[in-house]
Structure formats: structure tokens, C-alpha cells
A protein has these predicted regions:
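Sensor-1/coupling segment of RecA-like P-loop NTPase cores
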Residues: 102-107, 181, 193-224
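Conserved small helical "lid"/interfacial subdomain of P-loop NTPases
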Residues: 237-262
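Short glycine-rich substrate-engagement loop in P-loop NTPases that contacts/grips substrate
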Residues: 128-168
């Protein structure tokens, strides 16, 4: 059978190499070794060869694999903002030391986006929804682990989840947008903590409404709230607001360098990173006209 894949041109190789350099700078803190651990099937040796432009030994399939992961096409470039670094520090600490944290941050501060760039297979991020029941919450957690809870009881699903996590090296569960969960589902945080203390990292993360909800629940002696508050150390950690430098770096990484345009986007965004993304796209589209 004839190979119909297009050969990787020298020009495209140079573009992919530039995208790799940008990935190392913005996503891996300037460390090629860290980048190799974040990228799939891309060794530190490959990265060194590509950065030194000694490309003869690199196959086209390797180039294509790298392009999919760092390619500039129309993909939004992520920058290591203060919030990104803060969250990654907490995620790493919770994973390696089986710690438990409650994290809050205003919408648009990059919480969910940061969870999408965790380079570890043993991290399970539950994206909460208002419609979650106890069963659908457990089914989602099992799905993230590559397992099915179909046709089993909640107790059986919980048992599988716990046994699976206990066999993993440095596992971490992140319950994102936890303020969307009803009380009955939120109580699973207590059950998971009780079964996995010292064996698995646990994080609940949401907007500041979660803190208000927990504080109110503790004050009113609502069932389970004192237990949740105790397990996160009676303290919520706050994601820092994106700075002007953070937002300028994001704008520049995504193709806009004009100072006036950057300032305009910053002023309109109100430090909401989702708004920054929309404004950058609008500006780039306008420039094409």
C-alpha cells in the first residue's frame, strides 16, 4: 500500500521547532527535560536534536506527533501565569505528598485550563455538573480511570475506585467546579478522604462561592460541612488574579505584539482570561480583513 502521508518540509520543520521552543518556554519553565516528560513519545534526546537543527535522524512520524502537541495552527497558546504556576505547585504537592487542599479563584482565572495541562496519568480531574447524582459522580470518576460502573451499586463503585487508587503511584483527584455539586455528592469528598488519607492527593476547587457555602454550612452546623472544612485544613487557598504582565505574555504568545492593541485587550478583559482569548481572536480576525 502506498504511503499517502505528505512529507514534512524543511519550512514546516522550522515552524514545529519554533513551536517547541515556545512550548518549552511557556509550558515547561524553560526546561527541555520537563518538556519531554509533558509530551508523549518525545524524548529529551529528540528535543535536543530538534533544537540544534540536526534533523536527519528524526522521522516524519515523530515530526507529526510533535506538531500535534505543540503546533501553532489555530491552537491557543498557554502561558505560565502566576495562577498557572501557583496551581501546578499545589497539584504537584498534593500528588507527591498525598495532601488535601481547597482552592478558590474567580471565574476566568485559569483554574480549569490549568487542570487540562497536567502531564501525569495518575491525576483524575472530575469536571462537576449541577446534574450529577451520587451515581453519576462515581461513574464519571470510574470513567476517568478507564473503568465502568454500569450495573453496579454505588458501594461497589466506591470500592473499585479506592482499590484502584491504592494501587497507583502518587495519585491525585481534583474535583473542579465543586460548588456545582449538591450536598449529597459533595459528601463523597469526605468518604474519599477517609479511605485514602495519606495515600492519595485530594483537591476541591471552585469559585469563591464554595468558600461562602462551606463557611455558611459550618456556621449553621449543617451535616458534613464541618468535616469538609476540617479536611482541607480549615482554610481555602486563593488563585492569584492574572497580572498585567501575565495578560501581556498571553497576548504576545498568541500572535499580537502591538503595544496599543495589547493595552486595549488588557483594559477590556477585566483580567478574565476567557475574555482575553476572545478579544485576541477578534483582533487577529480583524487584522486579516
Amino acid at each position: 500500500m502506498t504511503d499517502t502521508k505528505q512529507q514534512i518540509s524543511e519550512e514546516l520543520k522550522k515552524q514545529i521547532a519554533d513551536d517547541l521552543r515556545n512550548f518549552i518556554t511557556t509550558m515547561a519553565g524553560g526546561s527541555a527535560n520537563k518538556a519531554s516528560k509533558m509530551l508523549k513519545n518525545v524524548s529529551n534526546g529528540y528535543i535536543s536534536i530538534i533544537l540544534n537543527e540536526k534533523w536527519d535522524a528524526i522521522s516524519d512520524d515523530t515530526w507529526r506527533n510533535l506538531q500535534k502537541q505543540v503546533g501553532s495552527t489555530n491552537e491557543w497558546k498557554i502561558v505560565q501565569t502566576r495562577g498557572f504556576k501557583f496551581l501546578n505547585m499545589l497539584f504537584t504537592d498534593a500528588r507527591l505528598h498525598s495532601n488535601t487542599f481547597g482552592i478558590i479563584g474567580n471565574t476566568g482565572y485559569g483554574k480549569t485550563q490549568t487542570t487540562e495541562h497536567i502531564g501525569n496519568d495518575n491525576v483524575f480531574v472530575v469536571k462537576s455538573n449541577e446534574y450529577f447524582t451520587s451515581r453519576t459522580f462515581l461513574e464519571e470518576l470510574l470513567r476517568l480511570m478507564g473503568k465502568s460502573g454500569y450495573g453496579t451499586t454505588s458501594a461497589s463503585m466506591m470500592e473499585v475506585i479506592i482499590h484502584t487508587l491504592l494501587r497507583l503511584e502518587s495519585p491525585l483527584i481534583i474535583i473542579d467546579e465543586a460548588d456545582k455539586l449538591n450536598d449529597k455528592v459533595l459528601y463523597f469528598f469526605i468518604s474519599l478522604y477517609n479511605a485514602l488519607e495519606g495515600k492519595c492527593g485530594l483537591i476541591i476547587m471552585a469559585t469563591p462561592y464554595l468558600k461562602k457555602r462551606i463557611d455558611d454550612g459550618v456556621h449553621k452546623s449543617k451535616k458534613g460541612y464541618q468535616e469538609i472544612y476540617s479536611r482541607i485544613g480549615r482554610h481555602f487557598l486563593e488563585v492569584p488574579k492574572p497580572s498585567k504582565n501575565d495578560i501581556f505574555a498571553i497576548i504576545e504568545a498568541n500572535g499580537i505584539t502591538d503595544e496599543l492593541t495589547k493595552t486595549g485587550i488588557y483594559n477590556k478583559s477585566e483580567c478574565d482570561l476567557r475574555s482575553v482569548k476572545r478579544l485576541v481572536h477578534a483582533s487577529l480576525k480583524q487584522a486579516e480583513v
